[in-house]
Curated annotation (Swiss-Prot):
A GO term from the CC aspect: cytoplasm
Gene3D superfamilies tied to this protein: Ribonuclease H-like superfamily/Ribonuclease H
Cofactor: Mn(2+); Mg(2+)
Annotated protein name in UniProt: Ribonuclease HII
Catalysed conversion reaction: Endonucleolytic cleavage to 5'-phosphomonoester
Primary role: Endonuclease that specifically degrades the RNA of RNA-DNA hybrids.
Localization (cell): Cytoplasm
Amino acid sequence: MIILGIDEAGRGPLSGPVVAAGVILDQDKIIDGLADSKKLTEKKRQSLYQQIITHAKAYTIVEISPQQIDELNILQATLKAIHQVANNLERQFDKVLVDGNKLPNWDYNSEAIVKGDSKIIEISAASILAKVHRDNICLEHDRLYPQYGFAKHKGYPTKEHLENIKKYGVLDIHRKSYKPVQVLLNE
């Protein structure tokens, strides 16, 4: 049975896109060290990212913008990204396994698996692609807006990030529907 593993990264940050990735592994090419991306060092994630995109049978990465997140809400934006991942790889898999407890409304043979990123290697691989891709976007944001410190906090609502929004203002990459950003917009 050919499995498509899907995971997302970036639901909690105040800025940047939510990213979903899907991976179909080549059963003849074993990738050692696949695990939940949050449990790996940045260096290990980068190394595995390269191995996954080189050796996977197929993969895709989908971004949903902060503007779409604000329009839809984060849950619907995440489900939209997951659905788009499956559509991008349509007819290449027998079953979809998604990390978490919710599935989009679709006709695919699928299952949501809580903590799937630490149980299913296809989901682990997707977790790594989504996390590294999103972290790279944050590094680009840091290059464009160095005073905000995106390389450090990756958009999460740290004390430093909130202070920098207060000091320098809300950017287009910020999620205006998120309460901490709304509070700062209304000050």
